[in-house]
């Protein structure tokens, strides 16, 4: 297991990882607006497919609201649960944006490159950082270093009304050593 090799792999594949993030950012998964329910569903489908592309046994799970995405990777050692959310805040008032918030762009700034678009920082960027780290680790080392459960919800920005009931119903599956 080589952290240096994994970091080098991340650097060498940064463009592809950025492209995947930009693709997810283009999905207007606004959980608080019923007009975007199909987009929330699309974001969940996108995440399931992306997790499956790196060998994660991932599924979309129905809730009374927006779906959960749950994925598992078997492994030795401790069980890690990673939580994130794929929904985003509304963009109103739209006239305050200098571009379409769902047309993310990589921009050069005096402090370096940044990604501007709704969800880049909260929470799609953070969510994909973990997924991309797992993708790189697996590419370099063949397997992930421990058992991992990926747990993504689509209602965090609307108060997570389905989260606690889902966690109670799936407590055994979601139980982990670390989260």
Predicted segments, located by residue:
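Acidic/histidine-rich catalytic neighborhood of metal-dependent amide-processing enzymes
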Residues: 114, 121-179
């Amino acid at each position: 297991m080589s952290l240096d090799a994994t970091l080098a792999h991340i650097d060498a594949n940064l463009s592809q990882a950025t492209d995947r993030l930009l693709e997810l950012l283009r999905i207007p998964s606004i959980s608080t607006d019923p007009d975007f329910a199909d987009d929330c569903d699309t974001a969940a489908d996108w995440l399931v497919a992306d997790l499956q592309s790196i060998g994660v046994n991932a599924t979309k799970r129905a809730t009374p609201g927006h779906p959960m995405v749950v994925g598992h990777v078997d492994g030795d050692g401790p069980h890690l649960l990673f939580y994130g959310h794929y929904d985003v805040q509304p963009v109103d008032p739209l006239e305050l944006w200098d571009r379409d918030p769902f047309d993310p762009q990589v921009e050069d700034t005096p402090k370096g490159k940044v990604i501007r678009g709704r969800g880049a920082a909260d929470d799609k960027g953070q969510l994909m950082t973990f997924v991309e780290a797992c993708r790189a680790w697996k590419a370099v080392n063949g397997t992930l270093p421990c058992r991992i459960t990926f747990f993504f919800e689509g209602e965090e920005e609307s108060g997570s009304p389905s989260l606690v009931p889902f966690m109670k119903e799936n407590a055994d599956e979601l139980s982990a050593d670390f989260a």
